[in-house]
Every structure is written in C-alpha cells, then in structure tokens.
C-alpha cells in the first residue's frame, strides 16, 4: 500500500543497523505505523534525520509492506517544541502512552487531533497536569475505552462534594469509605465534572484526578508500566 502525503507526529525513533532509523509515527490517515528510514545517518540524510525526531510534525510518503513501511520521503511541517525539564518528560509521556495503547494501522483521527493539541499546549507552557489529564481522557475515548464522567456507574449524577474511584470497565463509583488514605486516592466529583466539561478545575481537584486516571490506564497497559511514570512520579508534587 502506498502512503502519499500523509501527516503525522513522530512518537519514537531508534537507530537500526548502521545508517537507518526505525520510527513510530501517529499519522492522520493511517493511525500508528512503523516506518523504516534508510540512509539517514549519512551526510546526505541529515536533513531527513532532523525531521524524524520525537514530537516532530511531518508530512511523509511511504510504501507499506507488512508490519513496517519503507519511508520514501519526509519533511518537517513546523519547528518541534523545545521542551525542557517537566515539559520534556510530559512530552515523552504523551508519546509513550500513545505508542503502548494505540494499535498499528488503525486510523484514529480523534487521537491524532488530541496529540497535536497536547503537543501545542506543551510548546506554549500550558499547565502540565491539565494537559495530561485532557489527553488521557481523549486517548481512552478514541480507543473506545472511555466512560461517562458526569454520571456514576449506577446512573446517578456525579455529586461535586463526593469522591469517586474510577473502575476501568464500569466508570465512576462513589467512594463510601471515610478512610483518609482512600479518599486521597479518589477523584473529587468536582474534578470529574470539570474533566467532562473540559474546564480546568482548581489545583486540589485537578490533583485528585492523577491516581484514578493512572489506575485506569494501568489496567489497559497490563503488568508493564511506563518508563515516563517512573520519572514523572518524582515530579508529581510540583505538577
């Protein structure tokens, strides 16, 4: 299959043999695809190699043969955001999460748009925690793994004053326990309603979403977690 003038975001690139790269791209028309880019480590291939760096937005053509596509050409469509510190780790997280959960060769236009928006927010210094929670929500929804955020699994409306656990399959379940530890690990109703309405909540409510959303994602990821989680964990109090 010939892929012509598709656009995509580079999720990951690693060296292959002496002069090539294996690149994972989230494309607009074909979803996540693996691409073999030959000759990029030669003197003539430096411009192409620069276009295949993580977070870069590209236009590309390739010939799909089996699991890997053979890259025919690529060009950068903008300057990739120059991220440092926490923002750089957040960018790594977006890409790693997409790489792990998005199936290959399955068009996911909503995920493509969500990734592009999150990337743009990181580039302008928008709040990291809210950017990540919004992306997690959109990723789950685009993969058919999302659930209602404004109503509980029993059909009752979310109570802003209550706390909720997030079941990966059933959705929000009201927490009845009064134990402080369990309540701290549950999302506030206000936070869930804000996430449903795409309106950033206050800092305390926003912080309450991190662990419940992580549990949902961990369920779908399986026993192997994310490398970026290990790094972001050290920065959690600052986010």
UniProtKB/Swiss-Prot annotation:
It comes from the Bacteria. GO terms for biological process: DNA recombination; double-strand break repair. One of its GO terms (cellular component) is bacterial nucleoid. Keywords: DNA damage, DNA recombination, DNA repair. Belongs to the RecO family. Involved in DNA repair and RecF pathway recombination. This is DNA repair protein RecO. It comes from Stenotrophomonas maltophilia (strain R551-3). The gene is recO.
């Amino acid at each position: 299959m010939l892929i012509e003038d598709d656009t995509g975001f580079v999720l990951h690139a690693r060296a292959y043999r002496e002069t090539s790269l294996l690149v994972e791209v989230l494309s607009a028309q074909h979803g996540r695809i693996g691409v073999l880019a030959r000759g990029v480590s030669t003197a003539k291939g430096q411009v192409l190699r620069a276009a295949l760096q993580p977070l870069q937005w590209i236009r590309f053509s390739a010939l799909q043969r089996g699991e890997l596509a053979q890259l025919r050409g690529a060009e950068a469509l903008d300057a990739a955001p120059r991220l440092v510190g926490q923002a750089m780790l957040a960018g790594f997280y977006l890409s790693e999460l997409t790489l792990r959960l998005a199936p290959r060769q399955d068009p996911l236009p909503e995920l493509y748009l969500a990734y592009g928006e999150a990337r743009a927010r990181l580039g302008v210094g928008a709040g990291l925690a809210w950017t990540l929670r919004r992306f997690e929500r959109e990723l789950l929804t685009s993969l058919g793994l999302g659930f209602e955020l404004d109503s509980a699994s029993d059909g009752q409306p979310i109570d802003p004053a209550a706390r909720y656990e997030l079941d990966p399959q059933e959705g929000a379940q009201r927490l009845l326990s009064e134990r402080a530890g369990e309540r701290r690990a549950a999302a506030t109703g206000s936070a869930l309603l804000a996430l449903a309405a795409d309106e950033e909540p206050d800092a305390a409510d926003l912080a309450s979403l991190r662990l419940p959303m992580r549990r949902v994602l961990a369920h779908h990821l399986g026993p192997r977690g994310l490398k970026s989680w290990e790094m972001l964990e050290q920065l959690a109090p600052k986010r």
